[in-house]
């Protein structure tokens, strides 16, 4: 009796291995298809991610340029009693570039002064 049980167990094991091998070829093909589709999908997803990354970098650079323009200082201006003219920065608001007393013989350039009333 024990011999028959061992023989039947061996037979079941051989048959399971045999039929398992028959389905393995189909399983391998299905596995290859799944892997190819996953890699194809991953490739497309990676391309979409790269495109999105490039778009984000372009937007970020545009925003940084705008922010740099917004935070940039205005050109400096000359204050009161400071030389002005074509070789110097312009006078600040509220001041005008005028030829004061001594211009020509003492001073080489006009100066930023408050405009005279009158």
Curated annotation (Swiss-Prot):
Membrane-spanning ranges: none
GO MF term set: sodium channel inhibitor activity; toxin activity
Keywords per UniProt: Disulfide bond, Ion channel impairing toxin, Knottin, Secreted, Signal, Toxin
Signal sequence annotation: 1-16
SS bonds (residue pairs): 77-92, 84-97, 91-112
Propeptide segments, given as residue ranges: 17-76
Entry GO CC: extracellular region
A matching Pfam family: Toxin_22
InterPro entries: Toxin_22 (IPR012627)
Functional description taken from the UniProt entry: Ion channel inhibitor.
Domain notes for this protein: The presence of a 'disulfide through disulfide knot' structurally defines this protein as a knottin.
Family recorded in the similarity comment: Belongs to the neurotoxin 14 (magi-1) family. 06 (ICK-Trit) subfamily.
Name assigned to this protein: U16-barytoxin-Tl1e
